Amino acid sequence: MGSVMSLSCSKRKATSQDVECSSESRKRRKISSENDEEECCRLIPSLPDELSIQILARLPRICYSSVRLVSRRWRSAVSTSEVYSLRKELGRTEEWLYVLTKGHEDKLLWYALDPVSTKWQRLPPMPVVVYEEESRKSLSGLWNMITPSFNVGAIVRSFLGRRDSSEQMPFCGCAIGAVDGGLYVIGGLSRSKTVSCVWRFDPILNSWSEVSSMLASRAYSKTGVLNKKLYVVGGVDRGRGGLSPLQSAEVYDPSTDAWSEVPSMPFSKAQVLPNAFLADLLKPIATGMTCYNGRLCVPQSLYSWPFFVDVGGEVYDPETNLWVEMPSGMGEGWPARQAGTKLSVVVDGELYAFDPSSSMENGKIKVYDQKEDTWKVVIGEVPVYDLTDSESPYLLAGFHGKLHFITRDPNHNVTVLRADVPNIPVSSSSSSSSSVSIPHLKTNAPNKSDTVTWKLIATKDFGAAELVSCQVIDI
């Protein structure tokens, strides 16, 4: 009897142990399964995501297009601000050049250049949005006051009821700006009507989105950035009598997605014309805008197609919220127009401008000397090969602390050249020295002399597309 009881107890004990072992095994399998799932959900297996993000932030931006193809998690990781904020903390931001071109049927296309890898990327196309056209009005009041690049025939065709590419694209006559890591396309014409819409390209998301519209509709305006805010001045609007110039200005704050008014440009020189006839004939317009020494510098002209009369310019100080007349040497000496505009850029605090030659085969680069209130030549000959009647046969840009010139080469490829000038002049805006080196190139081709070296950064075949504008974004 005792042996039977002992055997029964042993069986119960064994059964209990088996149950416990089975339970422990299930727990281990569950934990292992959870660990496997956690491992699979990580960006990089065997590494915590915090470390993986550190690795991704150190990759060159040009690699991100491939990173997005790895998995949804990787695509999500490089499409958030976390990686880019970390890049900024690590000092790993990169300056890219964004070039706007106009192709077949006036279609606008954007391309981004990584100047380090010299690789180009095409941006997603801008949204196709058609805005309602105002009721048609008489052509008798229409006067052509905008630049020669403005397609007068397109406006006439739109009034006559003929279809034109601008009817399908509201970005004809748009202004371009870049602030806070975003690329902005501002205003323009849609079916001959000026619009106030603003579109933003986000390089992080690689997509376009519409942001708050301007306070006023305008086309062919000028833009500049001060204190992380985007300023828009001038341009034209369509009133009862046709297209009329604007003196108004406004500013966009990307942190609040809101526009605010800025005092209008006085155009003081236009107020002193000798008689009413000239005042009605010559229309004041802003022919450019550059942010220099913390202020907006706006060269101006009086315009009556096809003539321009330069009248200096005005300067806006955001601290005083006032416009003042531009120094005479700065305004009167601002180098010649390019299709009704004045081409300039600020690099390391120095204001440069391109002065095209009358032969259209070369030109000069000048720098503004604030102390002497004059423009001085720093590059005596700049290669220009695009002899076509395009809107912008050449562009200026500043990145990596250097001046860059964008034009077409003899094979009609878009070419980005860097000007290396050892003895770069320094104006009183950044140093007490006022010494100036005046180099001179002997040929039109990218060449090297004792004082300047033209270095080819990148080239690309855009076909028959014309250059329109360019911006630099650092993220």
Swiss-Prot record:
Alphabetical list of SMART domains matching this protein: FBOX, Kelch
Keyword annotations: Kelch repeat, Repeat
Repeat positions for Kelch: 94-140, 182-228, 229-279, 306-350, 352-401
InterPro entries for this protein: F-box-like_dom_sf, F-box_dom, Kelch-typ_b-propeller, Kelch_1
CDD domains: F-box_AtAFR-like (cd22152)
Domain F-box, chain residue ranges per copy: 41-87
Region ranges (Disordered): 1-28
PANTHER family named in the record: KELCH REPEAT SUPERFAMILY PROTEIN, OS02G0202900 PROTEIN
Listed name of the protein: F-box/kelch-repeat protein At1g22040
